[in-house]
Amino acid sequence: MSGQHQITEQPSGNPLSRTSTLIQEKPLTPTSSHAGTQKQPEAPRQPTFLIQLQNIRHAIRKPMAEFFGVALLIIFGAGSACQVVLSTNPDVASSARGSFLSINFGWAIGIAMGVWVSGGISGGHINPAITIAMATYRGFPWCKVPSYILAQVLGGVVGAALVYANYIHAIDVFEGGHHIRTEATASLFATYALPYMTQASCFFSEFLATAVLSMMVFALTDKRNHSPTNGLLPFALFILFVGLGASLGMETAYALNPARDFGPRLFLAMAGYGKALFNYRSQYWLWAPIIAPVLGAQAGGLLYDTFLNDGDNSPIKWRCASSQEQQLAEVV
């Protein structure tokens, strides 16, 4: 052992000594000896059109996640409304299939499934009001807001079209003819207020419900407030929407989401429901299910960030910090 220890520690000038062979344990191979002279084969290049398709797919991936999220929301929500209401006609079904609670569950499941599909890709907004609130309070890029909203509205159009195609024969029977289309079936896709509701009451109902929704979304995504894991967030939103529908859903059919109302309403206009969709109650479609939710989401985010948020991801927090730094500078 002592002789070996001396050999490994004392270098030798002879390149064939034992020390040199221990350092270079791997013998030379023909491949390694000619590595400098042989050219490595190049990886096969993809066709240009495939590269372009991949670039396009990458560019539209997040908006497409919002598109599919809203489409799923409408399929579950409007689909449940169609089943419950259309089945009340004895010529459509032998008995009623569900109740108002069934519709609440349908919309809640639609929210959960939509967020599950899109959450890990686009953030799972699936609501223009939430997208704008995230841009205002959470640093979501304003340049992405138009593409998100467009995708959300188109998702509403396609989701409504799929549900309509599925129930078209039941709608014909319910309406009493193939070319008869009235508010009775339009309300299965778009939102309509109860007759006794005033304009101000309709606006307030949508504003209040969306403010609660926005505040809860901010709470559920606040890492400093015992937020659920990403996998449990859709389930939490499911519970939230069941509660919103059960408590604030009767009077205006709780749109809470401009894309959920405007997308299906656009499809209904193309399906032959006429101008009455947009003339109803002095442009109800604009100020109740669009403007009120957008403002309600802003109010909910403002309340949460003003009184509850303790992170650095809010503009309100930044302004407070700036004012404190300015006061300290003045004291010094």
Swiss-Prot record:
Region (Disordered): 1-46
Cited InterPro entries: Aquaporin-like, MIP, MIP/Aquaporin, MIP_CS
GO cellular component assignments: plasma membrane
MF-aspect GO terms: glycerol channel activity; water channel activity
Reactions catalysed: H2O(in) = H2O(out)
SUPFAM superfamilies listed in its UniProt record: Aquaporin-like
Gene3D superfamilies xref list: Glycerol uptake facilitator protein
Motif range (NPA 1): 127-129
Motif (NPA 2): 257-259
This protein's UniProt keywords: Membrane, Repeat, Transmembrane, Transmembrane helix, Transport
Pfam families to which the protein is assigned, alphabetical: MIP (PF00230)
Induction remarks: Expression is up-regulated during development of the basidiocarp.
Positions in the Extracellular compartment: 88-100, 166-199, 252-283
Chain intervals with Polar residues compositional bias: 1-40
Cytoplasmic side: 1-66, 122-144, 221-230, 305-332
Subcellular location as annotated: Membrane
Membrane topology: Multi-pass membrane protein
Residue ranges of the TM segments: 67-87, 101-121, 145-165, 200-220, 231-251, 284-304
Chain's role: Water channel required to facilitate the transport of water across membranes. Does not mediate the transport carbon dioxide across the membrane.
NCBIfam families membership: MIP
Family: Belongs to the MIP/aquaporin (TC 1.A.8) family.
Free-text domain note: Aquaporins contain two tandem repeats each containing three membrane-spanning domains and a pore-forming loop with the signature motif Asn-Pro-Ala (NPA).
PANTHER family: AQUAPORIN OR AQUAGLYCEROPORIN RELATED, AQUAPORIN-9
Protein name as it appears in the record: Aquaporin-7-2
